[in-house]
Amino acid sequence: MKKLLIATLVCAGAAGVQAQERTVRGVLGLGLTGGGDTLATVVYTDGTTDNIKAGGLVHVFGGAEFRLGTDVTMQATVGYHVDETNGYSDGSLRFSRYPIELLAHYHVAPNFKLGGGARFVNNAKIDSRGVLSGARFEFDNTVGAVVEGEWMVSPAIGLKLRYVSEKYKANGVSASGNHGGFYFSWYI
C-alpha cells in the first residue's frame, strides 16, 4: 500500500512539472466589443432604428500560445468579428471580418499579463438579408494595433480587457474601427 501511495505521488508530481513546462497550448476565446464609427443605420417600418458599428460586437477566436520564457508568451489567433442589426422581419445588415492577431505578453505577476501586438483584418464587409438583401460593401484589408491586460482566474481561464486601434477604408472613405472589449479565454 505504501509503495502504491508513493508511486501515485511521484506520478502526480511529475505530471504537475510537465504541465508547467508546456511550451505550446491552445486558446479559444469570446469577446464583447464596442466602439468605432457608425457604418450604417437601419430604420425599420415601426420607426425604430439600429446601428452597425465598426468596432462591435462579438469576436470569437482560436489559436495557440507559445511560451518563450518564464515571463514571456506569444499568441497567434484567427477569429471572426461581427456586428449585426436585429433584423426581425424587415431584414438585417451585418458587418463581419476575419482578424488574425499576433500578440506578445509579459507576465507581470503569476496571474496577470500585459501585452499587445498586431491585428490583420481580412475580408471586412457589410452584407444584408431579408428585404435589405442586395446591399453589400467591401472594405480593404487593414492592420491595427492591440493593447490588453489579462487576469488568469485559473491556469486555464483568463479574463481580459483590451483596446484595438484600426481603420477601415474603401473607395476613398475611411471609418474608425477603434474599440474596447471584455474577453473570456480558455487555454487548453
Language-model features: where?
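Cleavable N-terminal export/targeting peptides
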Residues: 1-23
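Short glycine/proline- and aromatic-enriched beta-strand/turn motifs that initiate or cap beta-hairpins
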Residues: 19-77, 104, 112, 121, ...
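Outer-membrane beta-barrel translocator domains and adjoining extracellular loop/strand segments
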Residues: 38-47, 86-93, 124-135, 169-178
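Surface-exposed loop and membrane-interface regions of Gram-negative outer-membrane beta-barrel proteins
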Residues: 47-52, 74-97
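Repeated loop/turn-to-beta-strand initiation elements of outer-membrane beta-barrel proteins
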Residues: 4, 70-74, 111-114, 151-161
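Predominantly the C-terminal beta-signal and adjacent terminal strand-loop region
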Residues: 35-41, 135-188
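Transmembrane beta-strand segments that form the barrel wall of outer-membrane beta-barrel proteins
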Residues: 77-84, 116, 120-122, 158-167
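Short sequence motifs at beta-strands and strand-loop junctions characteristic
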Residues: 52-57, 92-97, 137-143, 174-176
